[in-house]
Amino acid sequence: MNKIILVLIFLLFGRYNIDAEPIRLATTTSTENSGLLKVIIPHYESDTGYKVYVISVGTGQALRMGQDGNVDVVLVHAPKAEKRFVKAGYGINRRSLMFNDFVIVGPYDDPAKIRGHNDLLRSLEGIANGKHLFVSRGDDSGTHKKELNIWQKARLKPEISWYREVGQGMARVLQMANELNAYTITDRGTWLVMRPKLSLDLLFEGDPELYNPYSIIAVNPARFPSVNYLGAMSLIAWLTSVKGQKHIKNFRLKGERLFFPTAINK
């Protein structure tokens, strides 16, 4: 039923909205840094006549903007926080959109000796036990939430002597890790964008714990009547349609596929 409603919204409020109210989309720095939105949003705008204003922040801040009614729709990657956002009545029509993954990067000489490990928790133990510098986003983003979660699962408590919370976006964190010869956890997309500028190496990948799902959620018009709910639902309908999912599937960075669509099982 939800899929039928989304299709109807897309058809009714599609290409005929030349003078439609712009859509305010709060999204993660990873979708912006990777270049994904710069590629696919123009296709949506061309198809529908809507203009999308993209606000690139961490997931925590994006959800807070939704809680304040300052945006129309959020595209984020922190499932537990997303569910709380919807349960509290701030968001509706949460839809699975796509996934990618996180990786651990660090110095080429890898003093923690995590290169080649097939166990994420052992890799974190190598960093913590050796007190090797680790740079954390520390910004309540989806990446930061994931990082804190895996430290907790490893039953490790980072110490101030080697752990740096910097309150910055992913690109800046990678730069700082590079300057400090430190380790960090990053989404793969931002890593690929930044890699040519860094002397870091990808040291760990592939653990199921590093799975990184993205959802898109409309801000609840019953709570904030001024939001552009029709625009938000139009964007959700397009991104989760066969056409939108194909654009996500076909997106490449340096020849590498970064995002895997999840809204349509094909």
Segments the model singles out, each with a brief description of its role:
Residues 69, 100-101:
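Short, conserved active-site loops that position catalytic residues or coordinate cofactors/metal ions
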Residues 4-13:
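Sec-dependent N-terminal signal peptides
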Residues 104:
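Serine endopeptidase catalytic core focused on the charge-relay Asp
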Residues 21-47, 51, 60, 64-70, ...:
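Exported/periplasmic ABC-transporter solute-binding proteins
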Residues 73-99:
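Acidic, polar ligand-binding/catalytic clefts
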Residues 15-20:
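Sec/Tat signal peptide C-region and signal peptidase I cleavage site
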